Amino acid sequence: MRKLLIGIVALLALGAAGYYAFWTQQRPAGHYLSDLRVQLDVNEGTPGENGNLLGVQPELYPTDYQTPQRLQRKLQAYLEQARDLGLLNARTIVVLPEHIGTWLWATGEKDELYQAAAQQEANSWLAASNPLNFAGALLTAKGEDRLRDAYLRAKAQVMVGQYQRLFGGLAKEFGVTLVAGS
């Protein structure tokens, strides 16, 4: 009887571990219903030989970060409006918010992360759905707030490539210098 009970418990534990491993790999893409109506924030100078400075403060939502393509589509709407208004040329410097790139850690995550009511809840979903990456990042984390560092390190390698492709691609597409926050 004892062997049977141990066998059942081991089988249940193995099944739970298998289901958790399967669950962590599932990344369903939700519907994308972001507001693409835009309003430019700061426009200093006149487009011309000396160039101009254009500040863009996009209104972003968690689901805008589901994929780099969604974020790109949102930012393109702002830059297209600026181009239509004649505000962009080769000497234009477009400035985006300070931490616009930091949120790339949320790309490719489960729907629960985007529905989180608070940052801590989103961080918990990130750790739960990327257990091996997060554990490795926690071991190499540095600084006073090792947990916060680990959340970023867990996806840092992916974020670097996404950041370069996204913001570099926008700068090239619109022929401007783009200053995007970390």
Give a label for each model feature.
Residues M1-S182:
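Hydrophobic structural segments
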